């Protein structure tokens, strides 16, 4: 019997080479006054930033432009919102990575309401957002967060009392997601690696999540197959390999859909305090913590062969295996080793490179949530996972 489940709406999706050229046409659906948010680096080095701005201006669009240089903070969002609240913006367009997507989503949601975004953040503010927003169009330049598919914007403040919290409402899903793999060709190698590991983590965590359903399972498994086939190729050949970029773009898109409907697990549980207390990029946290967390997860589930998560981990292990016709335990052991190998090949930085050390382990463990992870790890296992990445 299939358990009941709920699947909410998705953006209009325009996927494929050259789809960025649809932007002027779709912008006009909402009006001619556009607030464009972009990242600070690769999009401009590639020439796509100038290309997109020229196309919008050539179509008679009144363009305002803001650069997002880092993960959005409450002060960043509040400042942009105050600048444009009285400007009759018709549509917000975000062209960039996950941070730009989150910033665009947050700005589009905050322009119509009063007060600081802090007042509406989950677990921090006391107000419930009414869901009003300016229409939002997402055009990602990385294959990672899948934020172009999600209903939340992640907002961070780094420091001793830092946090990573979400602004969330069903209405915050972008109206249109334009996913053009050509936009990813110029993505730097290091960012390709860490963004790819974020997508990988989201797919695996949502696949084995306690909230998974048949639709998220189908998308997550296909996304994981794409990760197996294309992640390393995008890392090694990404500047010229449009097939690998397309495969990773689809995997990231699927990861955004599955995390929205099935939730995430312990790796993302670690990401909240690590990203709040230290200036560690989100993809680095995922890339660092995935192998140790899932090694302990497999160990804790090994005596539960009928557990749905255990059965799914066997399926994923077979997807990533380089052999056939072995026992399940051999596949699972191979998958643990494969995760370590991928982390090494992608040259994922250690957490210590960002100031994290032994003395911070208890604080991180204390503030980490298991979310929808299929099994609890002990405090000792969580500490060991962190320690392995110092």
Model-based region annotation:
Residues 11, 21, 113-212, 308-315:
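A glycine/threonine-rich phosphate-anchoring loop and its flanking beta-alpha core
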Residues 1-91:
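ATP/NTP phosphate-donor binding region
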Residues 20-23, 45-48, 74-77, 99-104, ...:
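Short glycine/serine/threonine-rich phosphate/pyrophosphate-binding segments
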Residues 89-105, 141-148, 280:
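Glycine/serine-rich anion-binding loops at beta->alpha junctions
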Residues 189-254, 258:
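C-terminal and late-domain segments of enzyme folds
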Residues 81, 100-114, 149-152:
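Short Gly/Thr/Asp-enriched flexible loops that form oxyanion-binding sites at enzyme active sites
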Residues 358-390:
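Short, amphipathic C-terminal "tail helix"
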Residues 280, 284-359:
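Gly/Pro-rich interdomain helix-loop hinge
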């Amino acid at each position: 019997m299939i358990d009941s489940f709920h699947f909410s709406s998705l953006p209009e999706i325009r996927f494929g080479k050259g789809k960025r050229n649809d932007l002027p046409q779709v912008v006009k659906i909402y009006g001619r006054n556009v607030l464009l948010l972009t990242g600070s680096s690769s999009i401009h080095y590639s020439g796509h930033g100038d290309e997109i701005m020229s196309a919008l201006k050539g179509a008679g669009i009144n363009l305002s432009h803001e650069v997002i240089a880092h993960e959005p903070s409450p002060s960043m969002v509040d400042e942009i919102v105050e600048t444009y609240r009285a400007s009759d913006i018709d549509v917000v367009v975000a062209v960039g990575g996950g941070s730009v997507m989150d910033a665009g989503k947050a700005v589009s949601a905050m322009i119509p309401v009063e007060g600081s975004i802090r007042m509406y953040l989950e677990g921090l503010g006391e107000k419930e957002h009414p869901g009003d927003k300016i229409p939002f169009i997402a055009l990602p330049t990385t294959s990672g967060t899948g934020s172009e598919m999600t209903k939340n914007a992640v907002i961070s403040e780094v420091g001793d009392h830092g946090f990573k919290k979400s602004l969330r409402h069903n209405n915050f899903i972008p109206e249109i997601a334009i996913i053009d793999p050509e936009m990813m060709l110029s993505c730097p190698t290091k960012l390709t690696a860490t963004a790819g590991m974020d997508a990988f983590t989201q797919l695996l965590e949502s696949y084995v999540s306690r909230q998974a359903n048949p639709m998220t399972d189908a998308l997550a498994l296909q996304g994981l197959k794409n990760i197996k086939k294309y992640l390393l190729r995008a890392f090694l050949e990404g500047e010229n390999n449009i097939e690998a970029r397309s495969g990773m773009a689809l995997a990231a898109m699927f990861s955004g859909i599955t995390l929205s409907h099935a939730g995430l697990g312990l790796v993302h549980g670690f990401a909240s305090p690590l990203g709040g207390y230290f200036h560690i990029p989100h993809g680095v946290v995922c890339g660092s913590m995935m192998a140790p967390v899932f090694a302990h997860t497999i160990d804790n589930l090994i005596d539960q062969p009928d557990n749905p998560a255990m059965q799914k981990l066997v399926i994923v292990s077979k997807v990533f295996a380089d052999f056939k016709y072995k026992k399940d335990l051999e596949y699972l052991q191979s998958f643990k080793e494969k995760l370590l190998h991928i982390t090494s090949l992608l040259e994922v930085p250690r957490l210590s490179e960002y100031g994290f050390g032994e003395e911070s382990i208890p604080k991180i463990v204390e503030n980490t949530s298991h979310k929808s992870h299929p099994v609890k790890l002990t405090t000792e296992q969580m500490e060991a996972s962190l320690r392995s990445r110092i």
